[in-house]
C-alpha cells in the first residue's frame, strides 16, 4: 500500500584500528587490536552470508504478547529475512535515487527488521525512528523527518494512517515533495520471482542514528557500515574475551530505533548468524518478569537494559514467576544508556542469585550513538566494581576516595577502555588531564561516526576536536568530544555526569546524578534534580515519582510529609545542600528520552510553568 504524502561512496572493508604503543604517563589507555576478523564490507553482505550459510536457521523470534498474553511466537529464518529484504529493496528503487534516506516508523516486530534490512540491501540510508502514538503528535519524530528528509517512509498497515500524517513534516526544503509511505506487510513478501542482489550499490553510509536531544535541533549521527561492523567486533571482543563468537541467543526488549536496541536486537544476531529472541518495550513494561523468563526459557546468554529496567525486574518479578527457571547460562547483561546505580545492581544480583544468575554477568558499559553505541566495559569474568568518592572533592574536579564512614558518590567502574582510545581532557584548555582529575571524555576509533547529518558546524565541533600539546603516544586528533564528564582513577574509567547538566548551586558544582542516587535510596523510583533560577542565584529542586500507598488521605499526607523530610535531610547531610522544593508526582510524570534518561531541561520548563501535577499539594 502506498500513499503520496549524499552520502555516496564505495564500500569500505572494516578493520580494527591498530593503535600506537606509546603510553600516556597519566592515563595509558590505548585501544588494543581485536582478536576478531570481519572480511565483509557491508551489513548487506553479512545478511547475504548468513542466508547462504544458515538458510534454515531461525534468525529472529518475536514474542507477541498483544496477540496472546502467554506469548505468540513469530519466527523467520535467515533465508526468509534476506529474501523479504530483497523484495523490499526492489520496491524502494521504484521511488528512490542513490543517496536517498528511507525512514522506518513501524511497531516493534519482524516487519521493522525486514524494513531496516531492505533499506540496507537497497544501498540506501536507513533512518530508524519510533512509531507515533495514536492521537499524540510527537515533535521529535517530526523534527527527525524534517532533518533527514526521506524520500520514502516504511511502516505497517496497522499504523499507516497515523504515520501518513507525519509525511508532510519530512520536507526539508520548500517545494520538496512529501515522501511516499509504504506498508511493508502489504508487499508480496512471499513472491517467488527471481531476485538479483548484485544490482544494488554498496555506499559507505548505513543509517542515521538520531540521538536523544532537543526537539528543535535533532542530531542524526551518520554511521557507516565500517563504523557499525567495527563496533560489533569491539563489542564482541570486550564482552566475551577469547571466544570466537558472541554468545548465542540474545534476548532484547529494547526499541529497535534505539542504538543498543538496534545493535543487540537486529545487527549482532546477523553478524553472529545466531537467533535473537525479541519482544516489545511495552510487553516488558506491562510485565517485567517476561524478560527474566525469556532469558531462562531460551537459554539466552546476552541481554541489555538501562538502569530502570533492572529496577522494574527486581520489584515486579516474583518467585512464582521464576519457578523452575535457571539463569546460570546467562553470561552478559549489559547495562548503560542512563547512569548505572550501584545499589540497583546489588539488588538485581541478590534478587536473581537464587536462580543461578552470576554477578559477573552484569556488565556496566559506557557508550554513545556518536561512537555507534559502545566504548568501554570492564573485562569479562569480573563482578561490577564501584568506588565511593568524596562529594566535596568531586565538586572541585578531583576524584578521591571518601573516608571510612563518610558520605560519598558511589560510582561504578567501566574498566580500562580497550576497544577505543580514551582520554580525559580539560574542555576549556583542550589539554589532557592527569589521572584523578575530572574532565571531558574524548574518544578515538573507527567506531566513531562520520558526523551529524547536514550539520557541518556541529560536526566540526564534536567530531573533529584536536588536543593541545598531546602526550607522547597520543595523536593530536581528530577526537570525538562526548560531552560526558569522567575520570581515570586507579587505571579505570568512571563517569561523573554531563557537562551541560552540572548544577551550580550557591556557587558550587554538583552532579545531579549524585543527588538523584541519594534520593532513590529513599524512594526507589524515578527522580530528577534540577537547578532553577531565583532572584539572586539558582536553587535546587527535586522532582520525585511516587506510587500512592496510603489507605486513607490522612495516611497519604503523612507519608508524603515523611518522604519530604527524609529527602531534605539526606541531601543536606550527604551533599551539604538545602533543597528549595521537593516536588512529588505520579509515576510517568517526569519527561524522559526514548532510552529512559530523564530530560532535565524539559523538567525545568515544566516546573517553571507549574505543569507538574503535585501529589504533595495536599500535604
Curated annotation (Swiss-Prot):
**InterPro entries assigned to the protein according to its UniProt record, in alphabetical order:** AMP-bd_C (IPR025110), AMP-bd_C_sf (IPR045851), AMP-dep_synth/lig_dom (IPR000873), ANL_N_sf (IPR042099), FAAL/FAAC (IPR040097)
Swiss-Prot/TrEMBL keywords? ATP-binding, Fatty acid metabolism, Ligase, Lipid metabolism, Nucleotide-binding
Q: Which reaction does it catalyse?
A: 17-(4-hydroxyphenyl)heptadecanoate + holo-[(phenol)carboxyphthiodiolenone synthase] + ATP = 17-(4-hydroxyphenyl)heptadecanoyl-[(phenol)carboxyphthiodiolenone synthase] + AMP + diphosphate; 19-(4-hydroxyphenyl)nonadecanoate + holo-[(phenol)carboxyphthiodiolenone synthase] + ATP = 19-(4-hydroxyphenyl)nonadecanoyl-[(phenol)carboxyphthiodiolenone synthase] + AMP + diphosphate; dodecanoate + ATP + H(+) = dodecanoyl-AMP + diphosphate
Q: What happens when the gene is disrupted?
A: Disruption of the gene abolishes the production of phenolic glycolipid (PGL). Mutant can still produce phthiocerol dimycocerosate (DIM A) and phthiodiolone dimycocerosate (DIM B).
Ligase in keyword set: yes
Q: What is its EC number?
A: 6.2.1.51
What SUPFAM superfamilies does the record point to? Answer: Acetyl-CoA synthetase-like
Q: Name one GO biological process term.
A: fatty acid biosynthetic process
Q: Which Pfam families does this UniProt record tie to the protein?
A: AMP-binding (PF00501), AMP-dom_DIP2-like (PF23024)
GO molecular function terms noted in the UniProt entry: acid-thiol ligase activity; adenylyltransferase activity; ATP binding; ligase activity
Q: What class of enzyme is it?
A: ligase
Associated pathway: Lipid metabolism; fatty acid biosynthesis
What family does the Swiss-Prot or TrEMBL record give for this protein? Belongs to the ATP-dependent AMP-binding enzyme family.
Explain the purpose of this protein.
Catalyzes the activation of long-chain fatty acids as acyl-adenylates (acyl-AMP), which are then transferred to the multifunctional polyketide synthase PpsA for further chain extension. Involved in the biosynthesis of phenolphthiocerol, which is an important intermediate in the biosynthesis of phenolic glycolipid (PGL), also called mycosid B.
The name on file for this protein is 4-hydroxyphenylalkanoate adenylyltransferase
Q: What is the lineage of its organism?
A: Bacteria, Bacillati, Actinomycetota, Actinomycetes, Mycobacteriales
- What gene name is given for the protein in this entry? fadD29
Amino acid at each position: 500500500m502506498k500513499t503520496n504524502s549524499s552520502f555516496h561512496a564505495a564500500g569500505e572493508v572494516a578493520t580494527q584500528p591498530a593503535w600506537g604503543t606509546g603510553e600516556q604517563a597519566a592515563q595509558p589507555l590505548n585501544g588494543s587490536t581485536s582478536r576478531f576478523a570481519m572480511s565483509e564490507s557491508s551489513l548487506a553482505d553479512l545478511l547475504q552470508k548468513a542466508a547462504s550459510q544458515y538458510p534454515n536457521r531461525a534468525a529472529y523470534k518475536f514474542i507477541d504478547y498483544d496477540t496472546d498474553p502467554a506469548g505468540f511466537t513469530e519466527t523467520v529464518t535467515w533465508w526468509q529475512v534476506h529474501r523479504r529484504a530483497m523484495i523490499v529493496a526492489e520496491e524502494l528503487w521504484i521511488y528512490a535515487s542513490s543517496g536517498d534516506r528511507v525512514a522506518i516508523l513501524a511497531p516493534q516486530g519482524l516487519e521493522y527488521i525486514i524494513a531496516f534490512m531492505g533499506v540496507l540491501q537497497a544501498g540506501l540510508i536507513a533512518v530508524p525512528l519510533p512509531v507515533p502514538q495514536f492521537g499524540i503528535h510527537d515533535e521529535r519524530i517530526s523534527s527527525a523527518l524534517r532533518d533527514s528528509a526521506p524520500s520514502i517512509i516504511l511502516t505497517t498497515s496497522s499504523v499507516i494512517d497515523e504515520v501518513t500524517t507525519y509525511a508532510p513534516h519530512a520536507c526539508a526544503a520548500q517545494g520538496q515533495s512529501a515522501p511516499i509511505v509504504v506498508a511493508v506487510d502489504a508487499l508480496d513478501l512471499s513472491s517467488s520471482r527471481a531476485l538479483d542482489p548484485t544490482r544494488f550499490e554498496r555506499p559507505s553510509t548505513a543509517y542515521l542514528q538520531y540521538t536523544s536531544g532537543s526537539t528543535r535541533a535533532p542530531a542524526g549521527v551518520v554511521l557507516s557500515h565500517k563504523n557499525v561492523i567495527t563496533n560489533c567486533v569491539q563489542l564482541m571482543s570486550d564482552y566475551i574475551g577469547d571466544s570466537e563468537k558472541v554468545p548465542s541467543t540474545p534476548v532484547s526488549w529494547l526499541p529497535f530505533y534505539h542504538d543498543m536496541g538496534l545493535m543487540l536486537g537486529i545487527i549482532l544476531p546477523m553478524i553472529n548468524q545466531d537467533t535473537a529472541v525479541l519482544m516489545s518495550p511495552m510487553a516488558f513494561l506491562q510485565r517485567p518478569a517476561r524478560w527474566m523468563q525469556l532469558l531462562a526459557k531460551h537459554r539466552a546468554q546476552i541481554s541489555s537494559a538501562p538502569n530502570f529496567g533492572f529496577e522494574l525486574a527486581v520489584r515486579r518479578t516474583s518467585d512464582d514467576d521464576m519457578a523452575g527457571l535457571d539463569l546460570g547460562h546467562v553470561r552478559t547483561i549489559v547495562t548503560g544508556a542512563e547512569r548505572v546505580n550501584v545499589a540497583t545492581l546489588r539488588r538485581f544480583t541478590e534478587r536473581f542469585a537464587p536462580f543461578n544468575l552470576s554477578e559477573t554477568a552484569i556488565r556496566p558499559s559506557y557508550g554513545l550513538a556518536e561512537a555507534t553505541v559502545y566504548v568501554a566495559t570492564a573485562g569479562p569474568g569480573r563482578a561490577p566494581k564501584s568506588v565511593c568518592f568524596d562529594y566535596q572533592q568531586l565538586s572541585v574536579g578531583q576524584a578521591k576516595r571518601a573516608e571510612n564512614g563518610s558520605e560519598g558518590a558511589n560510582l561504578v567502574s567501566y574498566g580500562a577502555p580497550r576497544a577505543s582510545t580514551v582520554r580525559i581532557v580539560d574542555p576549556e584548555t583542550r589539554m589532557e588531564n592527569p589521572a584523578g582529575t575530572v574532565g571531558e571524555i574524548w574518544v578515538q576509533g573507527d567506531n566513531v561516526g562520520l558526523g551529524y547529518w547536514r550539520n557541518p558546524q556541529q560536526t566540526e565541533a564534536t567530531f573533529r576536536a584536536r588536543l593541545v600539546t598531546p602526550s607522547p603516544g597520543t595523536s593530536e586528533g581528530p577526537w570525538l568530544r562526548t560531552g560526558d564528564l569522567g575520570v581515570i582513577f586507579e587505571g579505570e574509567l568512571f563517569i561523573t555526569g554531563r557537562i551541560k547538566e552540572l548544577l551550580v548551586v550557591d556557587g558550587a558544582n554538583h552532579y545531579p546524578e549524585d543527588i538523584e542516587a541519594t534520593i532513590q535510596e529513599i524512594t526507589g523510583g524515578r527522580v530528577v534534580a534540577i537547578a532553577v533560577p531565583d532572584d539572586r542565584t539558582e536553587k535546587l529542586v527535586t522532582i520525585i515519582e511516587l506510587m500512592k500507598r496510603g489507605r486513607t488521605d490522612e495516611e497519604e499526607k503523612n507519608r508524603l510529609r515523611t518522604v519530604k523530610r527524609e529527602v531534605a535531610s539526606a541531601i543536606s547531610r550527604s551533599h551539604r545542600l538545602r533543597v528549595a522544593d521537593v516536588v512529588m508526582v505520579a509515576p510517568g510524570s517526569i519527561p524522559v528520552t526514548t532510552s529512559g534518561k530523564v530530560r532535565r531541561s524539559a523538567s525545568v520548563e515544566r516546573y517553571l510553568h507549574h505543569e507538574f501535577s503535585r501529589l504533595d499539594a495536599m500535604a
